[in-house]
UniProtKB/Swiss-Prot annotation:
This is ATP-dependent RNA helicase DDX1. Residues 1-448 are annotated as: Interaction with dsRNA. Belongs to the DEAD box helicase family. DDX1 subfamily. GO terms for cellular component: cleavage body; cytoplasm; cytoplasmic stress granule; cytosol; mitochondrion; nucleus; ribonucleoprotein complex; tRNA-splicing ligase complex. It comes from Macaca fascicularis (Crab-eating macaque).
Length: 740
């Protein structure tokens, strides 16, 4: 409890955490919880099972509670960026007059846009009608920018209409889409001075104190309009100085800092943010936090964690809601009407409720994207952007929207692009590093070679049903065609899966198949062996987990596997991401995953908490023709076996190439075993019982001691000799000194 309390976690949550036997925070929790409690946006990556859910759930629960408590007591809270009309009382960049990807720091002066393809601009909170005025801009990086002045009528893309005057880093001045050479280029570490003499109608600029001369004469139609400091950025960061701090290059010739301008010269921005700030009025269907998960299983798991963490929170109590498909919408709407504070959901149903106005996003303070790489892979980037655009960037109590992104692969291009677009100066917490296999996991490859193992020819019809990719092909023995070898691979993989279970006497395993039809076929084959969903305790008792199974069945199947009612969970990669299954002794990859990162996710199911685990991958030595649906039905009722490039829904799958990519990714060579699937005993570990902890001190400890014992004894003798020699050398000079 004390460990979590030291990070600022409230006692009620710390008590609940202690009851869960979380004595110390994990690394990801220790790094992320203080950052989120401090109000920052966080990008986090850590291994599955490292406590990522707790890392974002605990601070989200606490801040939502504190927000509700403040509202209950009538407090408005402290603000980092002032809101409403009060924001206009200070010279700063205006959070209510900016582009969608333009971020403003809490001081209102540091600005950033990380959109690499589009320009995003912003204007200040105040403008000027009279006098000679000056402000400075410092460039913090090498991105593109234009700075200058514009009226309230001007586009935020400074210099592209007749109401704005800009000076860009490429050495061009711009007005009304006319770009002319002016001054010189500027970039990182340069300071640009922006001069405005309204009385004479002149605009000019300086670079690092060097006057670049007259840039623009203000046309007559603009002389009665206030001019506001403005900028536009493309993947750049700037910091403004309106005179509150000492200028690097103070102006001359009577120009004064904007912050020193007389009140009679100043005009406040019309964009006060009143329409964009969340209303204090209570809206039952407007949650304070929204957590988006890629699958219903992860959503349910996260909701259960939230229920545990908030166990002792009272007055006010927090109300949570799970919004997922497959559940009657009227039940969810009923809960929404009664009020909700935290929503956890999957994109499909969330999109439905948001688009119909049933779920109001106007009071969201936290947006959490869990397994963001999975969400993007499933094609939900547009949904995320639409949702983010509907959430106010600043709430009524002056708090900024916090965005938290969790991802297995933070450094992927898509995740980086998303973070640049929707996050505000995020802190990266990457404890995952390069993918690696824990030393508690043995992983081996079983080559499936239909040319050397002719078992498939002798089985007749007593084999696993295949996926009908070759329903129209001649796959009879003797055809010697790629289609024949492909069909043979499918048959052999069913046999090898059964053989692996028997050889290792597996009592629990997760079996990964590539497609939903492969899962169904393997389940049917296990039923032919006497097992199946209803055969509790049977050697081949199993359940399926994939998207085509009904929601209640998926939930029930997962629970039955966790409780040990069945031995095998046959699933697609939906179960590889974050589902809370610990200590599974075995994993079988019937087919290698399309993406090399998913290999680590899959085998990460075993070997947790010092328990030994074995992952067996069945890898075809020949290409296998598999389904790859690009049709609108996503495979339902589709029998188009032509190749994708010919307008069909199949591809040739090269597992040997995938294996090579996985080995390169992990920087190791994965051991191969014979088709009998006998795994050789490790030299140090000796006989291993998968699913159980290593012997005390680690399985390899005793073997190492025996080997190193003679060397240690020799080192001890040498150390004794060296110490004795040192003492003699120190003693003799003293004796000689005394003699004289």
């Amino acid at each position: 409890m004390a460990a979590f309390s030291e990070m600022g976690v409230m006692p009620e949550i710390a008590q609940a955490v202690e009851e869960m036997d979380w004595l110390l925070p994990t690394d990801i929790q220790a790094e992320s919880i203080p950052l989120i409690l401090g109000g920052g946006d966080v990008l986090m990556a850590a291994e599955t099972g490292s406590g990522k859910t707790g890392a974002f759930s605990i601070p989200v629960i606490q801040i939502v509670y504190e927000t509700l408590k403040d509202q209950q007591e009538g407090k408005k809270g402290k603000t980092t960026i002032k809101t409403g009309a009060s924001v206009l009382n200070k010279w700063q960049m205006n959070p209510y007059d900016r582009g969608s990807a333009f971020a403003i720091g809490s001081d209102g002066l540091c600005c950033q846009s990380r959109e690499v393809k589009e320009w995003h601009g912003c204007r200040a909170t105040k403008g000027l009608m009279k006098g000679k005025h000056y402000y400075e801009v410092s460039c913090h990086d090498q991105g593109l920018c234009r700075v200058g002045w514009s009226t309230m009528q001007a586009s935020l893309d400074l210099g592209t209409d007749k109401f704005g005057f800009g000076f860009g880093g490429t050495g061009k001045k711009s007005h009304n889409k006319q770009f002319d050479n002016y001054g010189e280029e500027f970039t990182m570490h340069d300071t640009i001075g922006c001069y405005l003499d309204i009385d004479k109608g002149h605009v000019k600029f300086s670079k690092n104190g060097k006057d670049l001369g007259l840039a623009f004469e203000i046309p007559p139609h603009m002389k009665n309009q206030a001019l506001f400091p403005a900028c536009v950025l493309k993947n750049a960061e700037l910091k403004f100085n309106f005179g509150e701090e000492e200028f690097k290059f103070p102006p001359k010739d009577g120009f004064v800092a904007l912050s020193k301008a007389p009140d009679g010269y100043i005009v406040k921005s019309q964009h006060s943010g009143n329409a964009q700030v969340t209303q204090t009025k209570f809206l039952p269907n407007a949650p304070k936090a929204l957590i988006v998960e890629p699958s219903r299983e992860l959503a349910e798991q996260t909701l259960n964690n939230i229920k545990q963490f908030k166990k002792y929170i009272d007055n006010p109590k927090l109300r949570e809601l799970l919004i997922i498909g497959g559940v009657a919408a009227r039940d969810q709407l009923s809960v929404l009407e009664n009020g909700v504070d935290i929503v956890v959901g999957t994109p499909g149903r969330l999109d439905d409720l948001v688009s119909t106005g049933k779920l109001n996003l106007s009071q969201v303070r936290f947006l959490v994207l869990d397994e963001a790489d999975g969400l993007l892979t499933q094609g939900y980037s547009d949904f995320i952007n639409r949702m983010h655009n509907q959430i106010p960037q600043v709430t009524s109590d002056g708090k900024r929207l916090q965005v938290i992104v969790c991802s297995a692969t933070l450094h992927s291009f898509d995740v980086k692009k998303l973070s640049e677009k929707i996050m505000h100066f995020p802190t990266w917490v990457d404890l995952k590093g390069e993918d690696s296999v824990p030393d508690t996991v043995h992983h081996v490859v079983v080559p499936v070679n239909p040319k050397t193992d002719r078992l498939w020819e002798r089985l007749g019809k007593n084999h696993i049903r295949t996926d009908d990719v070759h329903a129209k092909d001649n796959t009879r023995p003797g055809a010697n065609s790629p289609e024949m070898w492909s069909e043979a691979i499918k048959i052999l993989k069913g046999e090898y899966a059964v053989r692996a279970i028997k050889e290792h006497k597996m009592d629990q395993a997760i079996i990964f198949c590539r497609t939903k039809i492969d899962c169904d076929n393997l389940e049917q084959y296990f039923m032919q062996q006497g097992g199946g969903p209803d055969k509790k305790g049977h050697q081949f008792s199993c359940v399926c987990l994939h998207g085509d199974r009904k929601p209640h069945e998926r939930k029930q199947n997962l629970e039955r596997f966790k409780k040990g009612d069945v031995r095998f969970l046959i699933c697609t990669d939906v179960a590889a991401r974050g589902i809370d299954i610990h200590g599974v002794p075995y994993v079988i990859n019937v087919t290698l995953p399309d993406e090399k990162q998913n290999y680590v996710h899959r085998i990460g199911r075993v070997g947790r908490a010092e328990r030994m685990g074995l992952a067996i991958s069945l890898v075809a030595t020949e290409k296998e023709k598999v389904w790859y649906h690009v049709c609108s039905s996503r495979g339902k009722g589709c029998y188009n076996t032509r190749l994708k490039e010919d307008g069909g829904c199949t591809i040739w799958y090269n597992e040997m190439q995938l294996l090579s990519e996985i080995e390169e990714h992990l920087n190791c060579t994965i051991s191969q075993v014979e088709p009998d699937i006998k795994v050789p005993v490790d030299e140090f570990d000796g006989k291993v019982t998968y699913g159980q902890k290593r012997a005390a001190g680690g399985g390899s400890y005793k073997g190492h001691v025996d080997i190193l014992a003679p060397t240690v004894q020799e080192l001890a003798a040498l150390e004794k000799e060296a110490q004795t020699s040192f003492l003699h050398l120190g003693y003799l000079p003293n004796q000689l000194f005394r003699t004289f």
